[in-house]
């Protein structure tokens, strides 16, 4: 019972922290992404291929937090569902957009499988919604036994993203 209670308390602490991590305000988006990757790797020893360019976020908080949430949900899906041993996370910022590539070598899935579980598993729907809120594009490819790749492009023109969603 005590161990179960400890796990619940730890889950609550992690949830509260992840609502708006201190690293986000203090150190920025790059450090927040690095912290998410550390969290992903805490329980398992993934082989990690990580490249994060200077991804400072000078736009408003809404944009940055939504982008953070999208990445967070992608990484949580890997941790919860993929059974992967390797994870690739590349994030760069060009003059026009953020480019994020997240890939694993896990068990993969089919879109039919996701649609069948739509009422109980909505991680991918949350990811798509976040990308849409930022006027971005997302491409998800997955196959049973071949892992999953998520390719996200988010334009830096915040005005068009906010205008689209007003």
PLM feature segments, named:
Residues 1-19, 27:
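Conserved DHp (HisKA) dimerization/phosphotransfer helix of two-component histidine kinases, i.e.
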Residues 114-144:
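ATP phosphate-binding glycine-rich loop and adjacent ATP-lid/helix-beta elements
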Residues 105-107, 122:
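Conserved post-beta-strand hinge residue in the HATPase_c
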Residues 146-148:
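Glycine-rich GHKL/ HATPase_c ATP-binding element in histidine kinases
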Residues 86-96, 103:
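Short beta-strand/loop element within the Bergerat-fold HATPase_c
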Residues 64-86:
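Conserved ATP-binding N-box helix of the HATPase_c
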Residues 49-72:
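Conserved short strand/loop->alpha-helix "switch" segment adjacent to the catalytic nucleotide/phosphoryl-transfer site
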């Amino acid at each position: 019972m005590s161990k179960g209670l400890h796990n619940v308390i730890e889950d609550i602490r992690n949830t509260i922290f992840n609502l708006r991590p201190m690293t986000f305000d203090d150190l920025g988006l790059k450090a927040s992404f690095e912290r998410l990757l550390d969290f992903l790797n805490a329980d398992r020893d993934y082989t990690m291929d990580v490249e994060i360019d200077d991804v400072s976020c000078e736009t408003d908080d809404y944009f940055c937090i939504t982008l953070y949430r999208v990445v967070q949900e992608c990484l949580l899906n890997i941790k919860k569902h993929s059974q992967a041993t390797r994870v690739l996370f590349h994030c760069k910022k060009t003059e026009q957009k953020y480019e994020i590539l997240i890939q694993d070598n896990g068990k993969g899935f089919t879109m039919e499988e996701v649609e069948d579980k739509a009422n109980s598993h909505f991680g991918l729907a949350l990811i798509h919604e976040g990308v849409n809120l930022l006027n971005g594009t997302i491409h998800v490819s997955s196959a049973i036994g071949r892992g999953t790749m998520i390719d996200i492009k988010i334009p830096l023109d915040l005005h068009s993203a906010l205008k689209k969603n007003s």
